[in-house]
Design a protein with these regions (language model features):
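Surface-exposed beta-strand/loop patches in extracellular or lumenal glycoproteins
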Residues: 130-144
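C-terminal beta-strand-rich structural cap/linker in extracellular carbohydrate-active enzymes
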Residues: 139, 161-207
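Short, isolated positions in well-ordered beta-strands
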Residues: 112-113, 155-157
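Surface beta-strand/loop "capping" patches
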Residues: 89-134
Length: 207
């Protein structure tokens, strides 16, 4: 995918259509090339956004919905990655979005992030998590956690096994525990128990 994205830029980002830029932004976010993704979204806003906020295929011509849908999808890719038992916050956050908030993000695993706020200049991230079922998950931050609170109570830090941000290195066992890369600890992750129908609010201070 990375090589394909590089080849796509052979003729320059200026040669890419509106929907192509949205596609590039999504691919870049998943590959954690946050600045390329942000560059693609910025070009959509500068050249492919009509006065009514619809997007177009060519610059200023021919309405096409693709970039509208792809734009919002790319923003979500920058803010959250999820799979069953694993949520990663701000996996591809560009410098241009160093502070912000998002609400009502539906994640895989029957989880909703009812509120997500971040201020990377202050190294602060807060999130409110709502689960549709009793479960235990891993929650990963963009860098090492200095301290954190759950529902206003300060928590003890723990070192969990797992290699970087690769979700493939995290496996949930039948007893509800997790296995990861042997001998490798990740200070950017916590284990979180969630109750069905209950909201859990977390506040993180990052290193």
């Amino acid at each position: 995918c990375l090589r394909a994205a590089e080849l796509r830029l052979t003729d320059g980002i200026e040669a890419i259509t509106g929907w192509g830029l949205a596609h590039l932004a999504n691919i870049s976010a998943r590959l954690k090339d946050s600045e390329l993704g942000f560059k693609a979204l910025s070009r959509i806003m500068a050249k492919f956004l009509l006065p009514n906020l619809f997007t177009c295929h060519n610059e200023g011509e021919l309405f096409q919905m693709d970039a509208n849908l792809g734009f919002s999808a790319a923003i979500l890719e920058m803010l959250v990655f999820s799979q069953s038992g694993y949520i990663e916050l701000l996996p591809a956050l560009p410098q241009g979005l160093s502070k912000g908030a998002a609400y009502g993000i539906l994640c895989r695993g029957r989880i909703t992030l009812t509120e997500l706020q971040w201020d990377m200049d202050r190294k602060s991230v807060s999130v409110t998590v709502l689960s549709d079922t009793d479960q235990q998950i891993r929650l990963k931050l963009p860098c090492a956690i200095k301290s954190y609170e759950i529902d206003g109570e300060r928590q003890e830090k723990e070192q969990l096994p797992g290699k970087g941000s690769c979700p493939e290195s995290v496996a949930q066992l039948k007893d509800g525990s997790y296995s990861g890369a042997s001998g490798c600890c990740d200070a950017s992750q916590i284990r979180l128990k969630l109750k069905k129908g209950g909201e859990t609010r977390l506040l993180f201070v990052l290193d």
